[in-house]
């Protein structure tokens, strides 16, 4: 049984609604309590948004608060672009979303899409947390190209930042009391790679996950397909068995992935990004940890691939996939989505993941099937998916807890311009 739901707009059912640190003007929570209203609300919102998911836990987002002439420049820049999703207005605060290329991955062409999707997830959490405090978007706009940041802030715009979007928010009242729930749900969200329970997921629950969204996710040009039937899940498992070893046999991609694999939790916390073997495979003995880390090292992998090791890892992943009660597939409505589409898709993904977390469900992305062009095309053809696929994950009730991933100290920062 396959269920597909296309993107819609409306009121969100998601919880809560919906390296600039050394640069002059960098701001981090907690906010100055004497600064008043929006500064405090923004500090709360960035703390929540910093918990957004990202590929390799690289946290590629960046945020600027535009003031004075720079805020007016933003209004002029996007006037008449056709990328507007709301009216302009006075008395608003202006925020600029950017991608910091010093914290992105890029070994594969598809990684650029993943980075924009990751930034979109952050954007949605940020706007949802602001809305929960009474600050609602009056307009969200997206530039036609990445190079518009300097038109907003001139030389003050960081060279490594690519502008992805601008939002104007206005306080329309007090918070609705949902901030705490949003914060707790965002903190509870995990990538859980362990086994899931055998019990199915009801159609009513899936309908909740794919319900209308607000904020940056409103009307996102995205469809969600759930592979639920035994035949479909077995077919997807077979697909993973056939293609799941690609990352391990791709030198550049695997070197980049391994570079984010931290030796232990302390090292991960110190770096503030990446992941540990325990976050990939669950708890393990010191001996198994050493063996796995040695086997996964790029130099070792180049030898082991001739012995079929990537295929063995793919078959192990496929076995877990076949026992999963549902597989979530998110795909654009277009074959060639725009940069704005990618950011909005990330916002939609954030809503979906938070709703799943609130429902007691877990997600485990199976990214290898979307990161290589030929594999992604074969996936779409095999399962009749229209538009470019950008996210595939196991969905189910977790049977084991996985630790949270660390956060970079700049993940909750913003730059005031």
Task: Name these PLM-found stretches.
Residues 1-12, 18-417:
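Acidic, surface-exposed loops and disordered segments
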């Amino acid at each position: 049984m396959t269920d597909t739901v296309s993107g819609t707009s409306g009121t969100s059912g998601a919880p809560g609604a919906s390296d600039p640190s050394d640069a002059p003007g960098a701001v981090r929570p907690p906010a100055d309590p004497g600064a008043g209203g929006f500064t405090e609300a923004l500090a709360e919102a960035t703390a929540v948004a910093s918990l957004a998911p990202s590929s390799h836990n690289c946290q590629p987002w960046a945020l600027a608060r535009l003031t004075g002439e720079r805020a007016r420049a933003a209004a002029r820049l996007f006037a008449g672009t056709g990328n507007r999703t709301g009216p302009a207005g006075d008395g608003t605060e202006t925020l600029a979303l950017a991608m910091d290329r010093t914290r992105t991955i890029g070994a594969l062409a598809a990684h650029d899409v993943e980075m924009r999707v990751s930034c979109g997830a952050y954007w949605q959490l940020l706007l949802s947390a602001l809305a929960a405090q009474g600050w609602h978007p009056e307009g969200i706009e997206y530039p036609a190209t990445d190079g518009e940041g300097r038109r907003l802030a001139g030389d003050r715009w960081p060279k490594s930042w690519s502008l992805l979007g601008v939002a104007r928010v206005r306080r329309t009242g007090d918070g609705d009391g949902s901030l705490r729930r949003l914060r707790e749900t965002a903190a509870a969200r995990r990538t859980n790679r362990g086994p899931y329970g055998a019990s199915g997921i009801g159609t009513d629950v899936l309908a909740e996950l794919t319900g209308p969204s607000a904020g940056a996710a409103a009307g996102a040009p995205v469809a969600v397909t759930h592979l639920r039937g035994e035949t479909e899940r077995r077919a997807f498992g077979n697909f993973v068995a056939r293609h799941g070893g690609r990352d391990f046999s791709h030198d550049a991609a695997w070197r980049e992935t391994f570079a984010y694999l931290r030796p232990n939790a302390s090292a991960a916390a110190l770096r503030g990004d990446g992941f540990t073997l325990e976050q990939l495979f669950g708890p393990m003995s010191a001996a198994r940890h050493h063996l796995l880390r040695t086997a996964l090292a790029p130099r070792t992998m180049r030898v082991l691939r001739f012995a079929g090791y990537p295929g063995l890892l793919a078959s192990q992943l496929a076995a877990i996939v076949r026992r999963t009660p549902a597989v979530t597939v998110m795909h654009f409505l277009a074959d060639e989505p725009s940069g704005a589409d990618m950011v909005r898709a990330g916002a939609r993904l954030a809503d979906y993941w938070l709703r799943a977390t609130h429902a007691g469900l877990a997600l485990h992305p199976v990214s290898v099937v979307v990161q290589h062009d030929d594999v992604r095309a074969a996936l779409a053809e095999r399962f009749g998916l229209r538009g470019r696929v950008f996210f595939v994950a196991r969905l189910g009730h977790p049977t084991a807890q996985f630790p949270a991933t660390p956060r970079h100290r700049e993940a909750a920062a913003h730059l005031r311009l």
